[in-house]
Amino acid sequence: MIIVTGGAGMIGSNIVKALNDKGYTDILVVDNLKDGTKFVNLVDLDITDYMDKEDFIAGIVAGDDFGDIDAVFHEGACSSTTEWDGKYVMDNNYQYSKELLHFCLERQIPFLYASSAATYGMTDKFVEDRHYEGPLNVYGYSKFLFDQYVRRILPHAKSQICGFRYFNVYGPREGHKGGMASVAFHLNTQINNGEQPKLFEGSENFRRDFIYVGDVADVNLWFWENGVSGIFNCGTGNAESFQAVADAVVAYHQKGSVTYIPFPDKLKGRYQAFTQADTTQLRAAGYSRPFKTVAQGVREYMEWLNRKP
């Protein structure tokens, strides 16, 4: 059996799909379906069972027998960068991850988990090194601290531990994320609602490392299949502008022109104007597949979003 926590979320459900595509269906999805809309991410997927995240971790702590486990993909977390309840975030992201990690280590189960580019904060160099890490919010700190915890364990671990620092992920199965969904998702919605697509003023100068979620799932499966341990950036290594995203959405729809709105005061000084993964360590580990450009990935995403039932 394979366990995917956060399996009803965006990245988790895409990992389940990638596993299905390779013939794996004995999958336990762990999530919190308090937001019931997330169920739609699982409708077309084949899984064996579902567990609530609280029931699951209680079983982990109690040492329950989950049978033979081939791997754990730990994607579940509070991913809101605007959540400031530190106790909740640290319990949910840090303590939960530690309990699950030790369960896997004791049983020599491969453990692959979601870290984040939020571990870096305001920097122009995104290298997997303590020198460049300085999270700006408690979410980023929870991910940073778990990475630090893993770094101390890695030299002595007898089974795989692999963390991925996700950059700006976009693509299918993110509709439940609301305001946290990607710019491509929101621009598509605006055009379909008959509105002009909107960007912040200066968006041609805001450049992020946008990575298609299908590529993220592929990275996860490749590292699992090859048994590689470590903490790796998961981005394309090529920053592109928000304007490029908008251009790709408009090109797909063949209508609409971008309207520019003032940059909000509340984001000034708290907004990463630039992110770009250093992929040196990812490539050195042996992952050599190309990543989709914004033009390629957004088109594929638009085709999925606007598919006819």
UniProtKB/Swiss-Prot annotation:
SUPFAM superfamilies: NAD(P)-binding Rossmann-fold domains. The active site is at residues 139, 177. One of its GO terms (biological process) is carbohydrate metabolic process. NADP(+) binds at residues 10-11, 31-32, 38, 53, 75-79, 92, 143, 169, 177. Substrate binds at residues 168, 179, 186, 200-203, 208, 271. Belongs to the NAD(P)-dependent epimerase/dehydratase family. HldD subfamily. Homopentamer. Contains a large N-terminal NADP-binding domain, and a smaller C-terminal substrate-binding domain. This is ADP-L-glycero-D-manno-heptose-6-epimerase. It comes from Edwardsiella ictaluri (strain 93-146). The lineage of its organism: Bacteria, Pseudomonadati, Pseudomonadota, Gammaproteobacteria, Enterobacterales. The gene is hldD.
